[in-house]
């Protein structure tokens, strides 16, 4: 456990963020390895099929992850206030609420999968392969949910090392499973999906056993599973749904944009898949410091230490801006090599378009860095509405661009989409946070 309410914020934020960074890097490394394995051993059609459905699976998975992170903000506030009974109850309630959401998403996703894929304009020659892959991912959502709840709760009490170790085990098993099921057993993209779900199942078991043995304060009882604390339930639903929908709105916009991308041909689908995989690594620190600040702000809000919150937000913003500069240098020096490394493709159209995406979008990363820090900090401070408004603007912007710029300009319209919406969505965030008590008061407590 790590108490983020005491000590130097500059050191605490970095030491707390480092394991999250390594965990996210491991996850993205697996994603890149998975892409390379599918592309190398199954070919461009299989890679395009997976790429055409990645946004859909991300939409669902990111909703669950965002929701669990929202639940964990309440846990962080309980931990910061040193209220261990409510901390334990928050974990029990998180499991119950999350399970209900996962079951609904699983059933809905499987029932409406075919209409959704057709809405996404997945090419007919890729439809069967895409269906096989995403069906397994959706069927494993309950497993994903349990992992998200446990890892988010551990981070809420300051333990970012255990989720890192568990994820490392999961990634190794996942890559090994890919090679076994795809290369040896010839299961195709179905093997890639099965390997993902099985590795997550093992991660859940390991994480649950460790949590039970290590942290007595988190050993939930039957009463902790009952949704009987109206105040906690209201706060958890508000925080969880806000962060879940915040993630979903972003992905709905991206999903709509993907429908236009899928009309541009197989090479563009592959190029965009590669560019997004690489940009996810480039943006990794935005997510890392965003998660860090949600927990940091939550704990310090619970402890009523508002000055530490102000300083922490400024420090995290500075750290991410340094990272942005490194991304720009990387995109302009070895961007094309990274595209080849991810896809294994030597097709000029793939290399050119993916590299162009990286070179243009990285120039505007400073804007999205501020967005991620401010949005997650506001969630940790209990502000739910404005982050949702900001995410809604992103969704609307991408939908409008998908309907206008992409038909007019093709893939360059896709490349321009995110920088445009970033400038739009940062406005309400900056207006709101500068008016919040965090910038005006010396002390603040949870209401």
Name each region found by the language model.
Residues 20, 24, 36, 73, ...:
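Transmembrane alpha-helix boundary and packing residues in multipass membrane permease domains
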Residues 29-48, 117-124, 180-187, 248-277, ...:
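Helix-terminus/linker motif at the lipid-water interface of multi-pass membrane proteins
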Residues 47-107, 144-163, 271-330, 335, ...:
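Small-residue-rich hydrophobic transmembrane alpha-helices
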Residues 14, 18, 30, 67, ...:
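Residue-level signal for transmembrane alpha-helical positions in Major Facilitator Superfamily
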Residues 68, 136-155, 163-174, 192-207, ...:
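Short runs within selected transmembrane alpha-helices of multi-pass transporters and secretion channels
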Residues 4-42, 55-70, 74, 99-106, ...:
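N-terminal transmembrane alpha-helices
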Residues 1-17, 75-140, 184-241, 297-364, ...:
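Short alpha-helical transmembrane segments in multi-pass integral membrane proteins
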Residues 15-34, 136, 170, 199-203, ...:
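Transmembrane helical elements of multi-pass membrane transporters/channels
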């Amino acid at each position: 456990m790590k108490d983020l309410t005491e000590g130097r914020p500059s050191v605490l934020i970095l030491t707390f963020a480092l394991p999250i960074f390594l965990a996210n890097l491991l996850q993205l490394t697996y994603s890149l390895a998975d892409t390379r394995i599918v592309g190398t051993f199954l070919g461009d059609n299989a890679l395009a099929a997976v790429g055409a459905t990645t946004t859909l699976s991300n939409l669902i998975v990111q909703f669950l992850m965002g929701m669990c992170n929202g639940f964990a903000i309440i846990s962080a506030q309980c931990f910061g206030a040193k209220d261990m009974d409510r901390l334990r109850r928050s974990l029990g309630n998180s499991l119950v609420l999350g399970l209900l959401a996962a079951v609904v998403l699983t059933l809905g996703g499987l029932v409406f999968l075919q209409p959704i894929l057709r809405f996404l304009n997945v090419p007919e020659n890729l439809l069967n392969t895409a269906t096989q892959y995403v069906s397994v991912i959706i069927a494993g959502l309950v497993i994903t949910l349990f992992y998200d709840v446990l890892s988010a709760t551990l981070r809420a009490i300051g333990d970012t090392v255990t989720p890192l170790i568990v994820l490392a085990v999961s990634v190794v098993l996942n890559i090994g499973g890919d090679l076994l099921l795809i290369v040896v057993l010839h299961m195709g993209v179905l093997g890639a999906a099965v390997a993902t779900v099985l590795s997550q199942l093992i991660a859940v078991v390991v994480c649950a056993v460790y949590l039970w043995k290590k942290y007595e304060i988190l050993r939930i009882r039957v009463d902790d599973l009952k949704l009987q604390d109206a105040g906690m339930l209201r706060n958890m639903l508000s925080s969880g749904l806000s962060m879940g929908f915040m993630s979903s709105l972003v992905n709905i916009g991206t999903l709509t944009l993907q429908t236009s991308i899928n009309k541009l041909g197989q090479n563009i689908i592959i190029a965009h898949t590669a560019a997004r995989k690489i940009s996810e690594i480039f943006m990794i620190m935005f997510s890392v410091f965003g998660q860090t600040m949600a927990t940091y702000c939550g704990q310090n809000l619970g402890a009523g230490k508002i000055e530490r919150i102000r300083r922490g937000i400024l420090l995290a913003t500075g750290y991410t801006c340094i990272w942005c500069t490194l991304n720009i240098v990387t995109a302009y020096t070895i961007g094309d090599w990274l595209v080849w490394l991810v896809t294994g493709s030597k097709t000029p159209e793939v290399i050119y378009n993916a590299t162009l995406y990286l070179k243009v979008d990285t120039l505007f990363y400073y804007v999205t860095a501020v967005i991620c820090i401010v949005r997650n900090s506001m969630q940790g401070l209990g502000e739910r509405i404005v982050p949702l408004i900001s995410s809604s603007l992103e969704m609307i912007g991408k939908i409008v661009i998908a309907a206008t710029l992409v038909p007019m300009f093709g893939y360059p319209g896709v490349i321009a989409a995110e920088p445009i919406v970033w400038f739009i969505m940062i406005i309400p965030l900056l207006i709101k946070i500068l008016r919040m008590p965090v910038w005006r008061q010396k002390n603040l407590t949870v209401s």
